[in-house]
Amino acid sequence: MWRLPAPTDRPRRIERLVAELVGDDEAHAFWNAFRDRFITEQDVAELAREGFNSLRVPLNARHIADPDGWALNEEAMARVDRLIEWCRGHGIYVILDLHAAPGGQTGTNIDDSERDQPELFENEIHGAATVRLWRNVAKRYRDEWIVAGYDLLNEPLPDWFARYNDRVLPLYRRITEAIRSVDRRHAIILEGVHWATDWSIFTERIDDNLVLEFHKYWNNPDRESLDPYLRMRDAWEVPIFMGEGGENNTDWYAGAFRLYDDLGISWNFWTWKKMDTANSPLSIRAPEGWSRVAEAAGHGSPLPRD
């Protein structure tokens, strides 16, 4: 997304890079400014003009709650509140997506994990924190009608961590029970394992208000590839949702999104904006000197602060 090399491929490492470059105080000011400007009401208005009716909001547990999940970070949640207010004003439903759970649910850069391990499924400390975090989020938004549902975990467990697959549904059940203790209203959205493509973990319905989510990138957008999801939709009588798709060309988009519409599958595009791209709705121009930052990130070489 930010055209940075692998050593600096996740939020915590990018944050360290910025702090090393400008110092802790200026880094704090930078991130406050970034979070205020990266997504604004203008973005939400543009989403509505383009015909979208939902926004999937990725949340990082490290940013929105204390490490144990007991308390939410009010400064961070105020930004979520503000985004929800904008969405309400423009008729855009909000899906709250725990993209980076305590400990990491994927064990790769996308979950902001520290050691490239899905520690959420290795250490009960993180499981308990995740349950508490979701209960607090649900309690905060239980009366917010523009929130469509809670996407409990983004893309848990790629295939090389399949040994933990049998731990996903029990954790989903625990989170759902915690949410339902404070919120009976909102949908519970469950993703399969292996980049949200494998639904074999769904052996029982754990709630009466479920949505099952899959992600689709790169491979052919054809009916055959969607049949497993359609069969489960019909068998369980639940909505299904293509929660992430993109990173392709316009021909792929046209075929995929038309097919989803024809089959009654709701979908979201990933991602709304990124740097120097031709395959997202919005592209960010790289700022002057960004190539030097990327080079320093890749080689660990210091940069002068000017």
Over which residues does each language-model region extend?
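Non-catalytic C-terminal accessory domains or segments of carbohydrate-active enzymes
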Residues: W290-D306
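Active-site mouth of glycoside hydrolases
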Residues: M1-A187, G192-S200
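Extracellular glycoside hydrolase catalytic/binding regions
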Residues: V131-K274, N279-E295
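Low-complexity, flexible helical/coil segments
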Residues: R16-F30, H90-L96, E224-P228, G245-W252, ...
